[in-house]
């Protein structure tokens, strides 16, 4: 007797109270610092044009400096201390007692899908929860940006008769740090000197400033934007703003963008792309300080989905409701150097250091505490200096 496997029926219908398309567009490693001000329109004209009709956040800060812990924060609304996914050698799983973003949309009746090649957001980490469909291929084996964009457009067209939630990811910016071959369309715009590779074999989190990699990074972003333009055009040709909720967000910046001598958690590493367009989204550019933990409550609020606000660390920013974030946690948990600093926002910034006892017992490593000085608040962070002790 042959075994048969059946999936859930796919309802071909649109219901009031839902969007026809909700898209979480994860751009791994897209640093806000390189697309500030006029540089945004210069490097990413298609993305600028699309999201200028919505909300662009210029002061979104990542809770962690690399993908594994940071992405877990985005999808769970929990900071690293609460989801405990931080160790580069010990695999973890999203807390089962805390619903993920995808589970909230599934509960609302959306047809939920995930298409990406991120090896730090795989099913065994809990990212398959709430999904009707999961299409996973390693980035270098079928999920590169040019392939992913076309696959997403085909997917959206295929399931056009449903109210669909789709999580997609593009991770090719890591190719710069990893020293992999870039697209021919990128390489032809680089000089021979810029194509020379340095710090090969060093994990991207720990890389030092590199003018060559910075040039490669910016050229890759321009190439990405050209590809993203196909997706934006498809969306605008098939939906109105009242029918969609589109977000583009990132998990961390890049170490090789930080000038020599600046602190580890500089804005080039911590500030990330964060933007939204669609129903309930204001047309604005905001410099309100936002955490990546806020991504879950923002998406749920914009989609009119109830969520358990008391059980997560993410909050709704003031530009959406009358609320003001009191602090942001910027964490470096890259073993063996682990520290956490909490930036207190009111008045002159204060800092709080917490010993990560649970992580120490689990990882069997040591703790290096890094002290931050000279916190200055002029409605946003202007500079941040670091000194060890």
Question: Where do the model's predicted regions map?
Answer:
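Catalytic domains that recognize anionic headgroups
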Residues: 1-389
């Amino acid at each position: 007797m042959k075994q048969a496997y059946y999936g859930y029926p796919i309802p071909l219908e649109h219901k009031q109270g839902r969007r026809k398309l909700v898209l979480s567009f994860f751009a791994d490693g897209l640093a806000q610092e390189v697309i500030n001000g006029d540089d945004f329109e210069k490097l990413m004209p298609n993305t600028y044009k699309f999201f200028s009709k919505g909300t662009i956040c210029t002061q979104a800060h990542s809770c962690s400096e690399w993908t594994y812990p940071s992405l877990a924060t985005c999808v769970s609304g929990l900071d690293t201390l609460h989801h405990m996914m931080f160790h580069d050698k010990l695999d973890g799983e999203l807390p089962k007692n805390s619903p993920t973003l995808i589970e909230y949309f599934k509960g609302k009746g959306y047809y939920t899908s995930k298409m990406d090649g991120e090896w730090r957001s795989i099913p065994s980490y809990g990212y398959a929860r709430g999904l009707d469909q999961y299409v996973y291929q390693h980035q270098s084996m079928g999920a590169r940006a040019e392939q992913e964009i076309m696959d997403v457009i085909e997917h959206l067209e295929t399931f056009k008769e449903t109210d669909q939630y789709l999580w997609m990811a593009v991770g090719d910016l890591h190719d710069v740090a990893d020293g992999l071959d870039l697209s021919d369309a990128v390489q032809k715009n680089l000089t021979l000197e810029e194509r020379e590779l340095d710090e090969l074999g060093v994990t991207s989190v720990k890389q030092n400033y590199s003018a060559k990699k910075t040039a490669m990074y910016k050229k890759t972003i321009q190439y990405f934007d050209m590809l993203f333009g196909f997706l934006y055009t498809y969306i605008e040709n098939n939906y109105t703003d009242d029918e969609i909720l589109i977000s583009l967000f990132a998990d961390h910046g890049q170490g090789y963008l930080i000038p020599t001598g600046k602190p580890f958690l500089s804005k080039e590493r911590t500030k990330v792309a964060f933007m939204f367009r669609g129903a309930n989204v204001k047309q604005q550019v905001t410099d309100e300080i936002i955490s990546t933990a806020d991504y879950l409550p923002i998406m749920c609020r914009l989609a009119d989905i109830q969520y358990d606000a008391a059980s997560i660390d993410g909050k709704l920013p003031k530009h959406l409701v009358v609320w003001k974030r009191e602090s942001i946690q910027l964490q470096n948990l890259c073993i063996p150097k682990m520290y956490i600093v909490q930036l207190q926002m009111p008045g002159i910034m204060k800092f709080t250091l917490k010993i990560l006892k649970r992580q120490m017992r689990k990882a069997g490593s040591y703790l290096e505490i890094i002290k931050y000085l000279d916190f200055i608040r002029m409605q946003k962070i202007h500079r941040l200096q670091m000194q060890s002790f």
